[in-house]
Amino acid sequence: MPTLNQLVRQGRRRFEARSKSPALRGCPQLRGVCTKVYTTTPKKPNSALRKVAKVRLSNRLEVISYIGGEGHNLQEHSMVLVRGGRVKDLPGVRYHIVRGALDAGGVRERRRSRSKYGAKMPRSAA
């Protein structure tokens, strides 16, 4: 524990919060190109085949991002928009692909939470 004299001379060191999405470098989203689209399995209590993509961002950094929703049309060389946001049961996945932007199509037949999945208003409910 510092003495009062030491605190007068140097003060307390300020705690600096680390970014949870450092590859975006302060931007809300970044465009990128898919270099690999694959499935992976989640951590221990859960079981599934989660769809993820390795994306080279426009700032030349490579990140692993999650493809949300049921079904997708992404493949290698697809242009995608990447936002922050981790997937709790996939270690190393700290980003999400924005559905309905660039080459990533929206989720078909989606009725609820449509804005999160880039789905248009269904014709029948108009």
Swiss-Prot record:
The modification 3-methylthioaspartic acid is found at residue 89. Belongs to the universal ribosomal protein uS12 family. One of its GO terms (cellular component) is small ribosomal subunit. The gene is rpsL. With S4 and S5 plays an important role in translational accuracy. GO terms for molecular function: rRNA binding; structural constituent of ribosome; tRNA binding. Gene3D superfamilies: Nucleic acid-binding proteins. It comes from Tremblaya princeps. Keywords: Methylation, Ribonucleoprotein, Ribosomal protein, RNA-binding, rRNA-binding, tRNA-binding. Residues 106-126 are annotated as: Disordered. This is Small ribosomal subunit protein uS12. The keyword rRNA-binding applies.
